[in-house]
Amino acid sequence: MDHYDSQQTNDYMQPEEDWDRDLLLDPAWEKQQRKTFTAWCNSHLRKAGTQIENIEEDFRDGLKLMLLLEVISGERLAKPERGKMRVHKISNVNKALDFIASKGVKLVSIGAEEIVDGNVKMTLGMIWTIILRFAIQDISVEETSAKEGLLLWCQRKTAPYKNVNIQNFHISWKDGLGFCALIHRHRPELIDYGKLRKDDPLTNLNTAFDVAERFLDIPKMLDAEDIVGTARPDEKAIMTYVSSFYHAFSGAQKAETAANRICKVLAVNQENEQLMEDYEKLASDLLEWIRRTIPWLENRVPENTMHAMQQKLEDFRDYRRLHKPPKVQEKCQLEINFNTLQTKLRLSNRPAFMPSEGRMVSDINNAWGCLEQAEKGYEEWLLNEIRRLERLDHLAEKFRQKASIHEAWTDGKEAMLRQKDYETATLSEIKALLKKHEAFESDLAAHQDRVEQIAAIAQELNELDYYDSPSVNARCQKICDQWDNLGALTQKRREALERTEKLLETIDQLYLEYAKRAAPFNNWMEGAMEDLQDTFIVHTIEEIQGLTTAHEQFKATLPDADKERLAILGIHNEVSKIVQTYHVNMAGTNPYTTITPQEINGKWDHVRQLVPRRDQALTEEHARQQHNERLRKQFGAQANVIGPWIQTKMEEIGRISIEMHGTLEDQLSHLRQYEKSIVNYKPKIDQLECDHQLIQEALIFDNKHTNYNMEHIRVGWEQLLTTIARTINEVENQILTRDAKGISQEQMNEFRASFNHFDRDHSGTLGPEEFKACLISLGYDIGNDPQGEAEFARIMSIVDPNRLGVVTFQAFIDFMSRETADTDTADQVMASFKILAGDKNYITEDELRRELPPDQAEYCIARMAPYAGPDSVPGALDYMSFSTALYGESDL
């Protein structure tokens, strides 16, 4: 294992020296340490918004290592180097190692170079040193600390659990019960420990790790399979994991004890305050009840009715049975609460409770005595008054009962008889009202006897000098007057119902005839309005002529329709005449139809208004179709000429690009003259665009006079211009390539002939197989063996860098020119600079300005990096990196 030491002599550091160094090379242990240490680091790095994926790679530049130390220590380290060179990385790692050493840890055999080189052994050893110093060293249980302290803490916390015997930090944790016991000891609601089995370590470990990650914010540092599948789990990995549990739970017990002490004191104080509040409220409520009750008991004013006196007796009995006993209990409870409160205050060293003024126990006892005195004699007075009223109450009750029954029956009867519902009723409703009225007349006759009995009882009460005789007489007189009025209203309503029935029978016949004729006429008008307002969409003159003929036929039917309208309105006018003559209030409508005369007239007027609008619309559409036809013919005539012309030119360009002869300059001259002839044709295209704009504005979507549309013409024209421009550009590039690479005209012709030979589809490009055949024809030895395939793949990456699957002629020429001509290289440019620099490894600004033109000298000075070699002088520039950057071998 890694070598590290501390200035302190803590025992937890000593056993590490004796561990077998070869154990780290065990793949299972290394895997466990990688996962555990990575998770431990990420649990701290996430506080800074970052993490690591590969522990030996992500710490190589020292940046995240310094950030980790800042997070776990809470201190700032020296400013890191931001460069990407090895010297910068070593500097950053050394800063981190110096910080660890400043905390009293002696690092043995751990150097910055090994960390920067990604040495797994040294990196894991360094992280373990950090874990020991910042996560385990400060653990202290009784007289032990660090590793022994952590082990003792685990043993004490897991002691009550069966099947758990923690003796070390490797095999004692393999069955997973130790982790589960730690969680259950501190958070029993998270794990059902009784359901765990010692023979199922995978489930136990996964349960503990998942619960710790979800609820305790402890990341998963190991896989259960790695622990179970290893004879002796890695001790450092287990210690790291267990230390996370220690830090998660260490503060819980102290906080719980302090919270319990505070809660106990507060509970006693709150209980005493609640007892004080209860006493004050109970005393206040009881005194208020006594204050309200005494005046009620002292009130001896007699009542005039038996019911009122019985109610007083019942209220008094309710008071004795329901209201007073709870108050007696409250009074007793008040004294008990007072004594209990004083005892609790005395036992808890609190001052004695002093109730508010007037709420002492003695005050309550005095008020209670006054209440008892007021009760005396009240019940006997009540019984004597009841006997006195009992003699008159029976007869008065009989009068009230009969009067109430009669009044309940007559309630609403006058309003019902005064109703004029027959004025707005239909014929069927009138007949129903007559039947209902006959039933009411029978009921009215049956109530005559009760009215006579009410009058007799009222006379008897007057003779017996009843105290409430005036109200009895008034009620009796009201009943008699109402009875006479009901008789008169009944006769008047019968006459009105019979008269209305006859009028409605006549009106009903007229309504029926109106409905039979109005419905079909209304349907005809609605159909006519729909047809007249229908938005027609036509594209030819023939279609608009058909619509015009149909419209003329419709106008010929309007006179007969107007006669039918007048006949229907005549029926409605007859109904109105009857209503006005006999003053019938026609609140209802025609039961056979919802069509009104106003609706008929409104729709008829609308039809008359729509007819001339339809005439105008048809006339305008006819003129528009004639104009559209002229536009179609005009566009078709031009398109039928331009379309074939573009197609012919495209075919000619294709032949020219394949069959070009003579020198490249002759070909270029010929193509430019050809391009000029094409560009001169542009005014005709513009004129066609103007005609197309007119067609679009007229919303013309088809044209039988041509098969070409403007989109086809535009695409063809753009393709024509693009094709001629691309062909010219290819020839220009060929000239540039020829001049730059020294290719002869004969070689260029040979390349063109070979390319055209294998371009069998005349697309101007070669596929991979066509290109391969072309190279073979030119003498390249490309076999079908793996070496030949690799060579061909290299060539394809040159000629088709974007991996489009095709090779253009220009790419073909570029490749062939590189293969057949001399080219300058970065080494050649570098050698040239070295000559200018006097055989030095650097060059100065003065030398550049002396040897090169001014603009090119300034270009080099602005882009050359400072030279950093051991033989550097002030102002020295690095021409070597500049030369490689020119050819894409490094960044400029």
From Swiss-Prot:
The modification Phosphoserine is found at residues 6, 471, 677, 890. Residues 1-247 are annotated as: Actin-binding. It comes from the Eukaryota. The modification N-acetylmethionine is found at residue 1. PANTHER family: SPECTRIN/FILAMIN RELATED CYTOSKELETAL PROTEIN (PTHR11915). Residues 746-781, 787-822 form the EF-hand domain. The gene is Actn1. It comes from Mus musculus. It holds the Pfam family EFhand_Ca_insen. Ca(2+) binds at residues 759, 761, 763, 765, 770. InterPro entries: Actinin_actin-bd_CS, CH_dom, CH_dom_sf, EF-hand-dom_pair, EF-hand_Ca_insen, EF_Hand_1_Ca_BS, EF_hand_dom, Spectrin/alpha-actinin. The modification N6-acetyllysine is found at residues 95, 195, 676. Homodimer; antiparallel. Interacts with MYOZ2, TTID and LPP. Interacts with DDN. Interacts with PSD. Interacts with MICALL2. Interacts with DNM2 and CTTN. Interacts with PDLIM1. Interacts with PDLIM2. Interacts with PDLIM4 (via PDZ domain). Interacts with IGSF8. This is Alpha-actinin-1. F-actin cross-linking protein which is thought to anchor actin to a variety of intracellular structures. Association with IGSF8 regulates the immune synapse formation and is required for efficient T-cell activation. GO terms for molecular function: actin filament binding; calcium ion binding; double-stranded RNA binding; integrin binding; protein homodimerization activity; structural constituent of postsynapse; transcription coactivator activity; transmembrane transporter binding. Gene3D superfamilies: 1.20.58.60, Calponin-like domain, EF-hand. One of its GO terms (biological process) is platelet formation. It is found in: Cytoplasm, Cytoskeleton; Cytoplasm, Myofibril, Sarcomere, Z line; Cell membrane; Cell junction. Residues 274-733 are annotated as: Interaction with DDN. Keywords: Acetylation, Actin-binding, Calcium, Cell junction, Cell membrane, Cell projection, Cytoplasm, Cytoskeleton, Membrane, Metal-binding, Phosphoprotein, Repeat.
